[in-house]
From Swiss-Prot:
Reported consequences of knocking out the gene: Decreased apoptosis in infected macrophages, characterized by reduced CASP3, CASP8 ans CASP9 caspase activity.
Main location per the UniProt record: secreted
Effect of N259A: Abolished protein-arginine N-acetylglucosaminyltransferase activity
Active site residues according to the UniProt entry: E258 (proton acceptor)
Binding site for Mn(2+): D228, D325, S327
Post-translational modification: Auto-glycosylated: arginine GlcNAcylation is required for activity toward death domain-containing host target proteins.
Naturally occurring in which organism (per UniProt): Salmonella typhimurium (strain SL1344)
Record flagged with keyword Transferase: yes
Record annotation: effect of changing R184A: In 4RA; abolished auto-GlcNAcylation and reduced activity toward death domain-containing host target proteins
Name under which the protein is recorded: Protein-arginine N-acetylglucosaminyltransferase SseK3
Summary of the function given for this chain in its UniProt record: Protein-arginine N-acetylglucosaminyltransferase effector that disrupts TNF signaling in infected cells, including NF-kappa-B signaling and apoptosis. Acts by catalyzing the transfer of a single N-acetylglucosamine (GlcNAc) to a conserved arginine residue in the death domain of host proteins such as TRADD, TNFRSF1A/TNFR1 and TNFRSF10B/TRAILR2: arginine GlcNAcylation prevents homotypic/heterotypic death domain interactions and assembly of the oligomeric TNF-alpha receptor complex, thereby disrupting TNF signaling.
Amino acid sequence: MFSRVRGFLSCQNYSHTATPAITLPSSGSANFAGVEYPLLPLDQHTPLLFQWFERNPSRFGENQIPIINTQQNPYLNNIINAAIIEKERTIGVLVDGNFSAGQKKALAKLEKQYENIKVIYNSDLDYSMYDKKLSDIYLENIAKIEAQPANVRDEYLLGEIKKSLNEVLKNNPEESLVSSHDKRLGHVRFDFYRNLFLLKGSNAFLEAGKHGCHHLQPGGGCIYLDADMLLTGKLGTLYLPDGIAVHVSRKGNSMSLENGIIAVNRSEHPALKKGLEIMHSKPYGDPYIDGVCGGLRHYFNCSIRHNYEEFCNFIEFKHEHIFMDTSSLTISSWR
């Protein structure tokens, strides 16, 4: 199986190589905006996490693993490759979809073939502690806007929130942040549950009752990788500013925070909790823009007067043993 994976990977014909001469941070501190943040460790046993939410399981065979695995997008092989390279780590795969019995058996077989792979069904986890009723969010925002002076009040936004409140009260008064995202399609739902899993950290593996996870400590962290991130070697022990880092996309002279990699050294990291607070306080919050980027910028006090490029460099997850964002070289097959 190892040779098949390696052979498959070698056929991808990527035109780039791993970023050369990366200097990985070691223990010490990192400075942003005049504040020193300790570089906290994620050791070699911190679990990795991949995620695959499949909207259309019928596009796979009845007894096939329902994760894309083509020459252009070898996502399943990337997961297997990570499990082979990082034998000492638990490799979580958070899945969701209306899978057939045969597809579930195929996922169970994957766990037997690679004992450090742990398939976790999203429906097996309890996210109620991170939930909030939409009506409460709307009512709080209505009160906040109505308390503003009339000359600065956003009447259009106020009207839209009142419409949303009326719709919720009419159709489903118990509708919540979690249940509403469960109805969403596309990357928004994908991103939302990723954030919640990372808030749980290692606790999610323990909650799911996965065999062989007894070595994970409650309250520990997790390293999320998009399935198009390709490992070429062990990650080792990582040192991150206050125990968190994310992927940074670089295109030409521009850069942006991305959620293709999110690494945290502990459950309920305060930056992600701040992002959840924003989601709880905004009428139309976004799990990427608010839950990740907003949470990071609030927690590390990165305001508009600070240099965004400097913040990206500060919070960036860097590693010479990862090919970053390989889907940008082909076409993402997630749909």
